[in-house]
Each structure stands twice: as structure tokens, then as C-alpha cells.
């Protein structure tokens, strides 16, 4: 079971220190022993610990779109990702991996905005940073199988 973390400065003015994010990610080592990933930009930091189950070789996170302005971290599994991937390819999206269910999320958000969420079948918690609009979106599966906690401080 993976784990995701994030820090967002309310005004997006205070830089997130990599050491802050790395400390948070270290607390999740029991949830994902296989790898960790972090990214910081514009008052936002996203991180994750991964238990590699799907796409063992190329499923590293955070996952970015081609231009790097949309970033995703997620925990879970998207059962219908191949179907969504085929539809996105018809819209011109290119994938680095044919096997990453999480990579589908960044392209689906890019194509449909938050309207992509009802298309997802599976269990997931995800966070998306959209650098184009400077907005953060967090979501989880309909039944809450993958929990998502957040707070304002």
C-alpha cells in the first residue's frame, strides 16, 4: 500500500523546503518500501512512498504531463486504465508507459479537467497540482477504500 503527502502554502509564496517534504515522506516508509519520489514548485510540495504492484519498472511518481505543469501523486489502482488510455490516445495523448495506471490520471485530468473522476474505476486517493491554473485538486474513490486526510494550518 503506497502513501502520499503534500504541503501547500496557502498564498503560494513560501517555498516548500525539500527537507520538510522528505521528512514527511520518511514517515511513510512502512507503506511503500520500493521507492520514494518528491517534487517542489511554487509553494507546493508533493511526495510519495511506493509499493510497486502495477508497472514495476516505470511507475515512478510524481508523474508529470509532457510540459511538466501538471503533477500527480496517487495511491491505489485504476482498474479500467487501459480503456481510458486508449480513449486518451485517440485524443493525441502519448504515454511513457503502456502499463502505468497512475500515468493515465495526469493525461485524463489534462483532457477532461476534474470531469475525469467519474470515468475512473478502482480504489484510489490522488492529488493533482495544476501549474497552469495554480490549483490543487485532491480526490478519492467513491467508497473511500483509499483514505485521504487533509488539514488547513
Residue ranges and their predicted role:
Residues 1-153:
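N-terminus-centric sequence/structural signature that marks the extreme N-terminus
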